[in-house]
Amino acid sequence: MTGSIWAGSIWAIVPAAGRGTRFGGPLPKQYLQAGGQPLMAYTLMALAAHPALAGIVVAIAPDDADWPGWTAVQSKPVLTCLGGATRAASVLAGVLALPESVRADDFVLVHDAARPNLALADLDRLLEIGRGDPVGAILAAPVRDTLKRAGDDGGIDGTEPRERLWRALTPQLFRRHQLIRGLTEASAAGVDVTDEAMAMERMGLRPLLVEGAEDNFKVTTPADLARFEFELARRGIAVDADALEAPAVNAQSNARNVATQLATVSHGNDAT
């Protein structure tokens, strides 16, 4: 495992300021319950399970009353910062909130809050391959279905070749200074990048694709939640509540006392 070489050397950013409007319901999807715990508990535990992980920065909405106030997971620090109006803004806020010990050329992971089924083997492979590349890498899955191009009338205009198409997953691994530059330049140009690799692409960089498991899915619909609950039951997965540390303060108080004081607005879309 790569963690034996790079133990405690990687920080992760988890953008969690979105409302998950596609899912519906009163709770943001990252706080939906599965197996008695919020989805994000499984997400953070999956990241913290790798020995290379040093800590996690979670970007939350300014009005987030649901954040449990976790300060550590598996004894690894969890910091919080205020997220922005888009996923990209939240990721940038998280990168800027990293501890001073994280250098400009250090690699940083970015992982979706509502992608709780990350396999340790996939994370290990991403770190091993990505850290050997000057740009970085992302987990991805080859497109296996036949793709159709639709016309304005809903009819099929043609079939798209799929041989070189991949679905972008997370985590994604990039150097801190390149994340800052890429996300800042995209924002200045008015471009809403939907993942960090897109920001790298805009700078003419070519991250590597690292094949990951198909079941590293993002929970965006009730069917996705049911699928994850099935996976929990099938594999007998449970979160050790003692591994998630939180102070005895309410969530709203914790949200006000976040690590950075960036002036932002909460998400108005499904940007996590």
Swiss-Prot record:
PROSITE patterns: ISPD. The keyword Magnesium does not apply. It catalyses: 2-C-methyl-D-erythritol 4-phosphate + CTP + H(+) = 4-CDP-2-C-methyl-D-erythritol + diphosphate. Its EC number is 2.7.7.60. Pathway: Isoprenoid biosynthesis; isopentenyl diphosphate biosynthesis via DXP pathway; isopentenyl diphosphate from 1-deoxy-D-xylulose 5-phosphate: step 2/6. The record marks R22, K29 as: Transition state stabilizer. One of its GO terms (molecular function) is 2-C-methyl-D-erythritol 4-phosphate cytidylyltransferase activity. It comes from the Bacteria. Pfam families: IspD. The record marks R162, K218 as: Positions MEP for the nucleophilic attack. Keywords: Isoprene biosynthesis, Nucleotidyltransferase, Transferase. The keyword Nucleotidyltransferase applies. GO terms for biological process: isopentenyl diphosphate biosynthetic process, methylerythritol 4-phosphate pathway. Belongs to the IspD/TarI cytidylyltransferase family. IspD subfamily. PANTHER family: 2-C-METHYL-D-ERYTHRITOL 4-PHOSPHATE CYTIDYLYLTRANSFERASE, CHLOROPLASTIC. HAMAP family: IspD (MF_00108). Catalyzes the formation of 4-diphosphocytidyl-2-C-methyl-D-erythritol from CTP and 2-C-methyl-D-erythritol 4-phosphate (MEP). This is 2-C-methyl-D-erythritol 4-phosphate cytidylyltransferase. It comes from Xanthomonas oryzae pv. oryzae (strain MAFF 311018).
